[in-house]
Structures are given as C-alpha cells and as structure tokens.
Amino acid sequence: MMKIHLSRFAVTESEKSKCQEALHRILASGESGFPRIPEEELIWQQSLEVGSSLRRRFENLIVIGTGGSSLGTQVIASFRPGSRLRFLENVDGEAVDRVIHGLNLAVTGVLIVSKSGGTIETLAGTDALRETYERAGIGFYERCHVLTESESSALGKWAFQHQIPITRLAPDIGGRYSVLSQVGMIPACFDGYDLAAFRRGAEEALRRPDFVAELMTQFLASFHRQEWITFFWFYDPLARIAGLWLQQLWAESLGKKQDRRGHPAPRASTPMAGLGTVDQHSVLQQIIEGPRDKFVVFVRSEAAESRGAPLRRTEFVDCEPLQGKSMGVLLAVHGTANEQSLAQEGVSTLTLRTEVLDERGLGEMMMTMQMLVAGLGEILGLNPFDQPGVELGKRLAKDLLRKA
C-alpha cells in the first residue's frame, strides 16, 4: 500500500477538505471512465480472453502505438525480466529493424493500439511493419489484433477490410488514463501477469480518496511556494519507464492555456522524472545548488531496497562497509542520504513508499496517480482529460507531409 513516508510540510484539515470535495466531484462526474475500470467486467473479460489467445498463438508480441497507447504498457513490461513484448512507438527510419531484431516473425503477433484510429505515427508504423513481414514472406494480417475506439476510423476500416479482429475501447477513457483498460491489460496478460491483482490494486486506490486528497494538498502547496518543476525520483530500478508515463499523465492533463471557463489557466508545474542513484550523478547538482523552484517527490519501494544477495567479500577498501549487505541496502542508503541532503539544503521534498511494485502495487500506484492528477485538474479549474495544445502540431505535420 502506498503511503506518505516523509513530508516536511503539514497539511491542514481545511486544505484537505477542499481537495476531498474536488476529488469527489471529478470522480463522480462521469466525465472520464477511468475510475470505473475496476468494476467494468467486460474490460477484464476481454483482456483475459484476447491476451490468452495471443499468448497461445505467439511467442512474441509487437505493440504498435504511441503516447498513452504505449507508455503505460511499457511500464508493465519493464517489471518482468525477459518480457516477450516489443514496442514500436517512435517515428524513425530504423525503428522497425530495432524492434524485430532477433525475432522469428512467424511466431510474432502484432497489437495495434490507437484510440482515435487515426494517429499517423501508428498507421505509418503499421505500414512499415507490414512491409517487413511481406518481404519475409510471412502473412501479416492474420497475426494482427486492433484496439481502437471507432470501427469507422481509418484503422477500424483497415482492420475490417482485412478481417482483423477489433477490440473496441471505451470512448470516455483517454489514452493517458487507459493503462488499466484493455490497452495495458491485454499485453499484460500475454506477458503472464496476474490481471486480478492489477484490478485489486486499482480497487484499493479508489477506496482511499483521503490519501489522494492529502497528496493533492502537498502538490498544491508546492505550487503556492512557486516550485514549478515537480521532480519524481523513483528509487526502484524497475521503474525507469514509470517516470515517463507519469510525466505524460501530468503534463498533458495540467499544462493548459485556458481553464474550463475560457480564462487564462492557473499555472501548474512541469514534471520531470529521475531514477535512483543514476540521476544522483546527473541532475542532483542542479537541484541542490540551482534555483529553489523544484519539488522533489521520492517514490521508494521496500522490495527494491531488499533485493540482491549479500556481498560475501569485497576487494575494494571503499566497499568494506557494504560487505555482508545487499545492493538493495546500498540503494536504500543512497535514497535516504539524498533525502537528507536535499532537506538540509532547503529543497522541498516528499517521500512516498510502497511495499512492492508487483501487479497489485502497480495497479494501486497507477490508479492513485490518475486520481491525483484528475483531482488537481478539478481544483485548479482545468480540464484534465483533453490536450488541445497537441492538436496543432498534428495538423501542421499532416500539412507538411503532403508538401514534402
């Protein structure tokens, strides 16, 4: 269970009450279907059936999608050594070659994910991968499964034309809020994860609105202190991608020009993500001695800090204190030292702890963060479910492509 382990700032009952009311409003509004996911039997039934079918047929699965159609699933895949999932998400000339490297395409399925069914990067990636299969003399269409909202979209029509099965996505669950839907759960099932545990974790998060409201007060207080960079520092090596997923969720939901009434939007922070000791050797210097415009949120896992066999002996004098201890202990020590050093230098911090980021832990963390971001959007008067700033670039890219 996720909890606040260490906070330098007290929360008043008045502030918490306002956040509780805002969180209740946004979750009860029905504007987004993400809070409903744990109780939607169809989502879990389809995820299990489709994921199991793909698992029986194929040894590997390539997921084509970008942004919310990919990042959350990548988080899940990163927690299983030897994952059989590959991801085609970015547009570059060598992406397909990298993704298929070492794969036997004859036993590799393809899951194409686009909520709108018109994301040009996803459609282009599908074309590029199709041509790769065709050059290898391997049938492509019969190895595909499509996830999309509308069968009348470009992707939906293409799938119908080639008799490719389609799983329809709920129209009220946006991409960045969709990881616990079929978008993330079908690949998770393929990779052997326990879907029921994800579901339990999400249910646990929904039963703890008071905890989410307390988190909301912490972040709102950081905005009031003019801390406009929120740095999520994950101290679990398996959570490298989780920071990128959270970065998208936060930025697209809270970075708005206008509020719901069409007035200039209140400012929300820019998210950044860091990983354990790696970023103690990259961005820590700037955080400690740079401007006091950052709120550092440590996310620590008890399981990560107990992993590894004890070091029986060392051949380095500097490592003698580690003898008899695991690498997890070293990770824990560095995390605590980092917390203490930032506090001593006057940097605002918050530490969140969870026992283990397994299926249940991931389900809880992901639902908690989605509730947090939606609640912050509501209390700031923003729409946390749209992304109007992204649309202009899409339109310009299509115009430029026609002229290229």
Features from the language model and the residues they span:
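Glycine-rich phosphate-binding loops that contact phosphosugars or nucleotide phosphates
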Residues: 52-209, 395, 399
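Extended, charge-enriched "interface" segments that sit outside catalytic cores
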Residues: 1-52, 312-322, 337, 376
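Hydrophobic alpha-helical scaffolding
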Residues: 40, 86-89, 115, 119, ...
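Non-transmembrane, aqueous-exposed alpha-helical and coiled segments at domain scale
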Residues: 14, 136-137, 255-256
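Acidic catalytic cores of enzymes that act on phosphate-bearing nucleotides/polynucleotides
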Residues: 33-36, 75, 193-197, 207-341
